Amino acid sequence: MSREANPFKKMPTILMPDELMAKALRRGEKVANEMRQKELPWLLKARFVEEHKVRTIASVVADNLQKVIDKTPPVRKLPKFYQEMVEVLVGIDDFKKSMGAFKWASELVRKLGNEYARKIRKARTPQQAGKLRKEFVGRVKSILEQIHPEMAFVAVAREKLKDLPTFKDLPTVVIAGYPNVGKSTLLKKLTGADVEINSYPFTTKGINVGYIGEIQMVDTPGLLDRPLYERNDIELQAILALNYLANLILFIIDASEFCGYTIEEQINLLKEIKDLFKAPIVVAINKIDLVDEERVKEIEEKLKEVGIEEILKISADKDIGLDELKERLKKIAIKEFLKDKDAENKELEC
């Protein structure tokens, strides 16, 4: 499945039992009024009116529930990133169980509609036809009340899931590093265009997305910018979900320390991210125009000591080293993207 759009954007508004029943009864009454205009024998007309009422109510309720099913993607067929988001935000098992309740109710209401329509056709009096229709309405109300908790759950889930960020199915670089190290400036300089801002769970700042040709660059303010011990379990899961998005991590170090964090603190965060993500890491030492060469060499040595091999020296502000960085990111991200796609295809074949 393509990641061209958030797969939950098309989920329709979830009507609660009273709302859905009111809608169905209004539609049923409208159809009944049309039927009452027909010139028919009184018993035949009574059957005709009540049968069409029942069929209309059944159709409105069953179709509405089925529409929710049809417009909601099967979770297990989603890209891993979105599967993780469903698990973090609402729980996959609870979500699937609730969608199952919609299916059960839709099928049962449709079946009952057909059964009661047949019974009404055989009614011996208008009163009997009306009684059967009322009985049917009562059973539909009971079914909807039975799945009320699941309807409420899916309504809340929809609100959370429809605002998930939209990512394209492209080689993706996720940018990390402490606040004020130059991530936003670098993203704008590398992509050379307006940056899209997407919402993301557990951060009020949103996710910034830009593109270098066919490379997707994702900046995550509020997520990969502080130590993991400051996170709760759900925030950690939201961060871990990025594992399924990132083909490459670009970690920014502020050589000047003007960001307010020492080199040691920045490298400690880098080590945490290195342990957390399976994607390779490129480190860009930023603001090299503000420190001497000796200081940059010291930082390079410290990075090599923690196992970082891909190190580039840049100044996002002064446009130093950005072309080389851009080319390295493209080359590595595309290579890793193709490798990940190959692994996904092999997984599907098994």
UniProtKB/Swiss-Prot annotation:
The keyword Cell membrane does not apply. CDD domains: NOG (cd01897). It comes from the Archaea. GO terms for molecular function: GTP binding; GTPase activity. Residues 171-334 form the OBG-type G domain. The keyword Nucleotide-binding applies. PROSITE patterns: G_OBG. Keywords: GTP-binding, Nucleotide-binding. This is Uncharacterized protein MJ1408. It comes from Methanocaldococcus jannaschii (strain ATCC 43067 / DSM 2661 / JAL-1 / JCM 10045 / NBRC 100440).
